[in-house]
């Protein structure tokens, strides 16, 4: 059962309590501290991004295409759709001979209010570059290009890229591939269902 983790006070009075489950493990994977159920299964969602970002590095795409540390950081995380982020995504796509039209992450307004307001003020619409997962998707596309895999359908579970990603998730988590549940994340790629 989830445990209280955060209490919010307003004017000295308890306004709300947020519950959750958490686990801390050592380098051997042994649970050293927990709240609630440390074996609770959940979708990793964006918490998987640093692991998903290993493939562009391991495949050699990061080196081959001259990806800077700043650009690679956008592959590893969710971003706010600010110009610094969209520029990095566009730069990486160009370095790998790709374009925004190769992305399949979808479109939404930037999470940054300033960036979203700037688009509205300019009468412009958001693009896939503004999607908070466009960096991750760019990393996936660069990996496909480097490995000689088709970029078509790179987001589908049976694509070689997603199979390789599942292999890495299994290896790092210590959970067998056939025990990892799959769903579809909000940006169209597989999302992994594993214990905390």
Positions of predicted regions on the chain:
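Short, charged, amphipathic alpha-helices and their helix-cap/turn boundaries
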Residues: 108-122, 160-175
């Amino acid at each position: 059962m989830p445990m209280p983790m955060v209490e919010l006070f307003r004017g000295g009075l308890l306004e709300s309590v947020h519950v959750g489950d958490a686990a801390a493990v050592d380098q051997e994977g042994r649970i050293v501290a927990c709240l609630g159920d440390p074996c609770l299964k959940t979708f990793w969602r964006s918490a998987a991004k640093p692991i998903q970002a290993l493939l562009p590095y391991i495949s050699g795409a990061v080196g081959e295409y001259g990806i800077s540390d700043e650009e690679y950081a956008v592959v590893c995380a969710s971003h706010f759709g600010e110009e610094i982020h969209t520029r990095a995504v566009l730069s990486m796509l160009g370095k790998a001979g790709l374009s925004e039209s190769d992305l399949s992450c979808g479109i939404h307004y930037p999470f940054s209010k300033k960036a979203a307001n700037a688009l509205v003020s300019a009468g412009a619409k958001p693009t896939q570059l503004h999607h908070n997962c466009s960096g991750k998707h760019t990393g996936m596309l660069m990996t496909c290009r480097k490995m000689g895999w088709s970029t078509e359908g790179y987001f589908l579970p049976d694509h070689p890229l997603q199979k390789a990603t599942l292999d890495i998730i299994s290896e790092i988590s210590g959970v067998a591939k056939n025990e990892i549940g799959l769903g579809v994340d909000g940006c169209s790629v597989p999302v992994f269902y594993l214990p905390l």
